[in-house]
């Protein structure tokens, strides 16, 4: 996964409509400042295979290196979509062996109850350091 070119958008699903093919749909996400449309296809990774619905708070990642139409509201191909709980955040980044994100904005503090799994939901029992990780977190002081 070429996460380096992925951009995250967090917001609430305002609308879901039929796409241009039988295997796609258009998801309108309202952020704090604007509406952004995402094309969701069979190639889009939806974490935990959750059925996306209007009103859900989501994080959608799109690849900034792909072409996008110059339209308003903006429209991107969703590469990854995940549902977020209230006050939950998510990041997709490389974490070093000390579990510090590549941009030094996040340090992971794992506990025995920390759930670590692969993209297909299998338990991951190895050290997650030196890996690209999708990390869910809440702010702590």
Predicted ranges, named:
Residues 1-26, 47-109, 119-141:
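Short, flexible, surface-exposed loop segments at domain boundaries
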Residues 3, 28-30, 42:
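Homeobox/homeodomain signature
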Residues 31-35, 103-105:
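Glycine-centered tight beta-turn/hairpin loop motif at sheet-sheet or coil-to-beta transitions
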Residues 34-50, 113-122:
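A cross-kingdom feature marking solvent-exposed beta-strand/loop segments within repeated
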């Amino acid at each position: 996964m070429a996460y380096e070119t992925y951009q995250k958008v967090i917001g609430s699903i305002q609308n879901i409509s039929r796409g241009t093919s039988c295997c796609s749909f258009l998801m309108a996400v309202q952020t704090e400042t604007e509406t952004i449309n995402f094309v969701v296809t069979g190639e889009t990774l939806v974490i935990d295979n959750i059925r996306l619905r209007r009103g859900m708070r989501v994080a959608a990642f799109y690849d900034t290196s792909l072409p996008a139409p110059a339209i308003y509201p903006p429209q991107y191909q969703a590469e990854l979509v995940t549902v977020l709980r209230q006050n939950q955040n998510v990041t997709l980044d490389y974490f070093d062996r000390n579990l510090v994100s590549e941009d030094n904005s996040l340090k992971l503090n794992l506990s025995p109850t920390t759930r670590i799994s692969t993209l297909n939901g299998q338990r991951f029992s190895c050290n997650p350091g030196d890996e690209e990780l999708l990390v869910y977190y809440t702010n702590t002081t």
